[in-house]
Amino acid sequence: MRESEDSPSPKRQRLSHSVFDYTSASPAPSPPMRPWEMTSNRQPPSVRPNQHHFSGERCNTPARNRRSPPVRRQRGRRERLSRHNSISQDENYHHLPYAQQQAIEEPRAFHPPNVSPRLLHPAAHPPQQNAVMVDIHDQLHQGTVPVSYTVTTVAPHGLPLCTGQHIPACSTQQVPGCSVVFSGQHLPVCSVPPPMLQACSVQHLPVPYAAFPPLISSDPFLIHPPHLSPHHPPHLPPPGQFVPFQTQQSRSPLQRIENEVELLGEHLQVGSFTYPPSAHPPTLPPSAPLQFLTHDPLHQEVSFGVPYPPFMPRRLTGRSRYRSQQPMPPPPYHPSLLPYVLSMLPVPPAVGPTFSFELDVEDGEVENYEALLNLAERLGEAKPRGLTKADIEQLPSYRFNPSNHQSEQTLCVVCMCDFESRQLLRVLPCNHEFHAKCVDKWLKGNRTCPICRADASEVHRDSE
């Protein structure tokens, strides 16, 4: 290298040329490509730590005056494309060492938006706020409506996401393979094949959308690597499967009730495709390693632009399940309602059958009335009957004389008038005195004393 290349201006030119080269990799006359329209074959190559083709092969001619690139540059680009495809396929089975990943981070001062996704170690990811926006537009033919997720604040000790990199979205050939149930509602989640979206883990299992299952619930999720069945269609990606896993960490009962994620049943129609029963992945053998993902270090926000699909929840917890299984009790039967309804119907009396509901009701009422009468006879009257005229005349009476009157009572309680001379007074067995006309009228309806409520007929029984 010449000494002039170490000056700051050629370095800036090299960086600008690398930017122009990335943008010129796609065909020029085609319209601007959107992220969801790009396939896995259009991803540009990733940067190797021991390859510096970007600085050595750039010419100093401005981008607008350059013509077709030389043959050696095209051959090197094709070799890097093939090498990147082989590396992205083998990334699930080998892991780059930590020092090599740091070497990848250092020489790259600029990250273009269409750089291929690469594995990031949790310790190598800086604690910064990155945002990933996956927008799935209506590419499915009258199918599910787009769902957009916003993931923010990746902690250094959590699961690193390929934030800041290009995440290809689903097209009509990449149908969602799994769904997430949030609080009783099934939400279809886009399933991206493993070579297109990967997250680093200890075992490096292919994670289809591993960043999005723990969105609302706080349960960790057990991720199974997708296995293709023999009858799996070749144009469909391998479907993912999320299985809830109970850990020993302490959680509140509300979180245990709300956090449920399950796979949708067989023949679930997503978009214009229907999964047959054979398309579901088989169970994972016991010897395969499993990776646990927790949602604690990820503070995420979810924005759904569409209403939830009309799926009913499968599992109900606690008392709600017991209440839903109990049938509603039948309404009570009113015997007087049916004859009334039948009488409203226009049925001829000669043709219509005879009904005996009213007779049965009347018989029951008559029996009840007779029983009440028998009870009244045994108990007697609540209010005793008045005395007869003969019984009233048998009570003692005398003319009032103020000179020889010995009783302390000086007035009649019935009429509230004082006793006068030569008035006829009647004395009850309780020794209470009244005007004869006043007390006789009282005793015709009552057999007790108006003052003390004593029985006025006891004198007659004693005399008899």
Swiss-Prot record:
Residues 38-53 have a biased composition (Polar residues). Pfam families: zf-RING_2 (PF13639). One of its GO terms (biological process) is protein ubiquitination. InterPro entries: Znf_RING (IPR001841), Znf_RING/FYVE/PHD (IPR013083). One of its GO terms (cellular component) is nucleoplasm. CDD domains: RING-H2_RNF38. This is E3 ubiquitin-protein ligase RNF38.
